[in-house]
A protein has these predicted regions:
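Short, ordered beta-strand-loop transition motifs
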Residues: 63-70, 153-161
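Surface-exposed, glycine/proline- and aromatic-rich loop segments on solvent-exposed faces
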Residues: 12-26, 44-131, 193, 250
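Hydrophobic residues positioned within well-ordered beta-strands of beta-sheet architectures
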Residues: 71-73, 95, 163-165, 182, ...
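Extended, solvent-exposed segments with strong compositional bias
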Residues: 122-160
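Localized edge beta-strand/strand-to-loop motifs within extracellular or lumenal beta-rich domains
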Residues: 157-176
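N-proximal, solvent-exposed amphipathic alpha-helical segments enriched in charged/polar residues
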Residues: 31-51
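Acidic/polar low-complexity flexible segments
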Residues: 3-29, 101-121, 173-254
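Secondary-structure transition/turn motif
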Residues: 75-81, 144, 167-171
């Protein structure tokens, strides 16, 4: 048979087992429930693989735990299913996390896919990509265009509907009080889509989302921001060859 995927040698079993959360919570940023509609218009694909047709892309918050040598990022969703048998335990969620914590960086995405741009005041310094298939969904990216699977582990706790990302502190270890800004994008994972984002068209089909006004529409279904309406306002400013420009959510590191 054809080898569809292989787990990393170092942790061959860690992916399929629910990950226990260990560490002290240092940060929690909530996201409104029921806003998995991108700019406010997006609808689910029609194939039964997307049942229950709600909640699969609905990010509820981002928590960060201090786990010693690593940070543990926890992303709970309203729903989590695995109809396609993804090794990491979740089929649908695609997370792109961009961190701005120092000078310099980039204002375009790591790879062409999401159809967004980033605030010129907050260029990103580190990119985390999480999806259910480790060969492309367990990556750390850098502004120079290089990326690695070293120092990142992506798993899940399906019982609690959580995507769990462990990041080695060698990649990111801010000082207390340091300003850290987060761009947290949720897409619909598509193994054949641009940078594994599922396309959005005017009308939903079996395998594409609906609700786009034109081909410049962002492929972002949910975006981390605590206040209602901010995500929709940001993501709806596209068209005429221009992509939506995202602003990051910034905190003083505890």
């Amino acid at each position: 048979g054809r080898v569809v995927d292989a787990a990393p040698d170092a942790h061959p079993l860690a992916l399929s087992l629910p990950q226990r959360l260990a560490g002290k919570e240092v940060l929690a940023i909530p996201d409104p429930e029921g806003d998995e509609h991108g700019p406010g218009t997006y609808t689910y694909p029609k194939d039964n693989a997307f049942a229950p047709f709600q909640g699969l892309f609905d990010l509820l918050e981002m928590r960060i735990l201090d786990s010693g040598a690593t940070w543990t990022f926890v992303f709970p969703f309203k729903e989590m299913t695995n109809p396609w048998g993804a090794p990491a335990g979740f089929s649908h969620q695609l997370l792109n996390v961009y961190l701005d914590f120092k000078d310099g960086g980039r204002t375009d995405p790591f790879a062409k896919g999401a159809k967004v741009a980033f605030d010129p005041e907050h260029p990103w310094d580190l990119f985390l990509k999480a999806a259910g298939w480790p060969q492309y969904g367990q990556r750390v990216g850098f502004p120079d265009g290089t990326d690695t699977a070293d120092g990142i582990t992506v798993g899940s706790n399906p019982a609690d509907k959580q995507v769990i990302v462990q990041l080695d502190k060698k990649h990111f270890n801010p000082a207390s009080g340091q300003r850290v800004c987060f761009y947290v994008l949720v897409g619909s994972q598509d193994g054949y889509g641009p940078d594994h984002f599922r396309p959005v068209a005017k009308e939903a089909g079996p395998w594409n989302l609906g609700g786009a006004e034109n081909e410049d529409a962002p492929l972002v279904v949910d975006y981390l921001w605590p206040e209602k309406g901010v995500q929709e306002a940001m993501l709806s400013r596209y068209g005429g060859g221009r992509h939506a420009v995202l602003k990051p959510y910034c905190v003083a590191w505890p």
